[in-house]
Amino acid sequence: MSFTENIKPLIEEINPSFFEITVGMAFAYFVNQEVDIAIIETGLGGRLDSTNVITPIISVITNIGMDHMNLLGDTLQLIAAEKAGIIKKNVRVVIGESSPETDEVFLSVAEANNAPISFADKIRYTENWVHKNGYLVTDLIDKTNDVHVRCELDLPGYYQLKNLVTVAEVVCHLPALGFELQPDKMLYAFKHVKKLTGLHGRWEIIHQHPLVVLDVAHNEDGMKELVKQIELSDYHELHIVLGVVKDKEIEKILLLLPKTANYYFTQASIPRALPAELLMQKANASGLNGHSYNDVNTALQHAISKASKQDLVLVCGSVFTVGEVRLRGV
């Protein structure tokens, strides 16, 4: 409140968006807390995003998918060009996933800005991953020296393996920027991500028997990864509580979801949410069947009541849908 009160005249003068105000609030908070490192994530794209006023110590682009195409472009190359807008002069950029469609875009922008560039998945990889006691356990291998490091992650979704490779590549460049790297603390951080960061909703198990999982997958690429995770899971029947927002390519998402699941269509309490009844109609057209509920937690309780102890109950489709479950619990 004090932040917004202090800048109220400026808000009235330039009429910033809600996101722009929260970005300013975050920057002010980081300054006041004197943080050593702040991880700033773009809201949408990169080139024109309000977070892009900073000059970072390292730029990171995880991967490129077909999302926000109405604003960023309808090809991977166009979307990559927008994302590449965060590449700054003489500042290293790490690309998480290489791709024939986008590599040249990043290489070209990096060269124009004299920015050192590395592709994480060309330098490191993971193997021998297993789930153990709620953790994702894997070997992280450096291709340049064949060093193997055993890592445990408290984010158990197998898709975190890609993120681990990206993070490891970023971290290895920190000593050159004046930061002391302590491998034991890095491994501790991997194992305690949720506790250290408050990051939730990434194949997050919140209940056993039945297994209740939250995942914020909300676009085509994210849903593809989520479906792979479902296929790797052991369960009797699958119950999916699904709520989405209006501005996503909903039909593409629906076509990816398993038709054998029991669906509980719902909506978060925000204006952007697609009404549950309309979502159900679109889902029916894609061969997905279930009932609609106007409240996320009501939908979840119905799913749990129908599930056996061996079943999997998954809440997904939007950050807002998952967020409402976290507010009230199971």
Where do the protein language model's features map onto the residues?
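ATP-dependent carboxylate-amine ligase catalytic core
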Residues: 1-54, 70-72, 100-101
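Nucleotide phosphate-binding/pyrophosphate-handling subdomain across enzymes
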Residues: 32-33, 37-42, 50-60, 64-69, ...
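Conserved catalytic-core segment of NTP-binding enzymes
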Residues: 46-47, 55-115
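Beta-strand->loop->alpha-helix junctions that form or flank phosphate-binding loops
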Residues: 96-97, 111-131, 153-158, 187-193, ...
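C-terminal helical cap/extension that packs against the catalytic core
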Residues: 99-109, 114, 211-214, 220, ...
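Acidic-glycine-rich active-site phosphate/pyrophosphate-binding loop
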Residues: 130-147
